[in-house]
Amino acid sequence: MKKVNLLAAAVLAAAFAMPAQADYTPNAYFGGFLRTGVQSKSLFADDAEKAHLGRLGYEPGTYGEIVLGTDIAKVDETVWSVSSRVGYRADKNWDWYTQNDSGSHIAFREYFLNVKGFFDFDKDANIWTGKRFYRDDTYVNDLRYYDLSGLGAGVENISLGEGKLSLAWLRRDESRDYLWDSTVDASYVATDTDGKRLDKDGKVKSFGTVNFLDVKYAFPVWDGGNLQLRHTSMIPHRNSDSYFEYAHAEHDYKGAQRYSVAFNQGFSLGWNKTEIIYDHGSNVNWGAFGNGGWIDPSGCSNKAYRWSLFNFGVVNFTERFGLAHNLYMTYSSGYDNTINSTNATDKKSDKAFQLTLRPFYQLTKMTKLELEGAFYTHTTKSYFKNDANDAWAGTKNSNAQGQKLSLAYVISPDASNFWSKPEIQFFVTYLHGNENGLEFSEYGSSAYQIHVDSASAPVIHEGTKTTNTVIFGVHGEAWW
């Protein structure tokens, strides 16, 4: 029997398939995001710090995304497309900044396949699989408070009654360190000089899997009003290598549940969103300004809970004057504080309040003034231990606070529209905090430590922490 050439067969099959798509011109698209600029001091403010005090006049460094995508096939009313996104971040103002330099990062953020129109009963529904963004955020503070981004698959916008249903399964492989568990014998877990977890063969084993099962249903309630109900189940799964170690561990970490109710309201003056989130389980310990998608491997958060409230939007009071706002409150408790237990934690509860107000006033067709004021307070109640009695001696509170005031002269294509991009901001910013708050030293949180070499050994003298500063600069932002 004559052998079939697989390549020839594939080419022949493609040729026969071409007539179904012969009249279709693919739709290619190019998009992206950019923020960059220069300022008088290098504060190295990361995303978490912006979440505390807002974006305006407080975004050093460069960040960008390039989006490339195209429709690759169409059969009847079904369209197949691919989309990709590459992200770049640079923390320092260097001319030649490579991947080998600290603070420079390139990441493949999205790469997924989408099919629209496959279901005869609902041509607007989508089927997707691959790596993609799956998150909600507050623009003014850049807080990605609901972030499940990763590899996955799902269906979106399925018509159900008056609303739309979306289902998704996403998975992350994240580092997991079990060294906190003293019941794991040293013969099973060892560390190298950098403290990384090694197996008995000297290989690093530090990954575990978290599966996210997400369901959301959005439906209209009245003119301009939309309600979304959402539930996410977070299920951790250890890889096979980890079972060897964890068979000798006293405690395990469990999954988590997240429930959300979000209400969007559009009206003649603008738009507003209010969302309430309840978390229960091992994702609670991400802290007040995290995203709720991180699973605490220590086991101390298995029974913890967190309530969070978000309210943000934009209101145009007149043709020239408007206000963008962001309000956030959160409270968590229920941590395991068992003495002589390897999953003991000293945290009892934490609570936070954050408010950002950004009024803006249009000067001309392409210019406006923006003034952003922000405030946050974050209090953590912790147990402190009586070593002599091996028990908790009581509780103490630690409070972090910060304030920011930024004034910016902004140029954009349409200064009457808050969302108009691209824009260039000429800004001056005043930052203030307390001793437990954010660090405003020019070169980051380690800058206020002075290292002095003595004859015997290096000595570290801790200087005065910078709790207030003034910066000025020019910042640009664009999306397309």
Residues of each region from the PLM?
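Surface-exposed loop and membrane-interface regions of Gram-negative outer-membrane beta-barrel proteins
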Residues: 39-121, 133-146, 178, 196-203, ...
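Transmembrane beta-strands of outer-membrane beta-barrel pores
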Residues: 36-42, 86-92, 131-135, 169-175, ...
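Beta-barrel outer-membrane channel/assembly domains of diderm bacteria
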Residues: 2-4, 8-122, 127-128, 156-165, ...
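Outer-membrane beta-barrel transmembrane domain signature
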Residues: 117, 180-201, 363, 377-406, ...
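Transmembrane beta-barrel outer-membrane domains
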Residues: 25, 57-63, 103-110, 144-150, ...
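Aromatic- and glycine-enriched pocket-lining scaffold segments that form the walls
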Residues: 144-262
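Detector for outer-membrane/organellar transmembrane beta-barrel domains
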Residues: 213, 218-406, 411
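Extracellular structured ligand-interaction cores
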Residues: 27-29, 63-65, 81-83, 108-110, ...
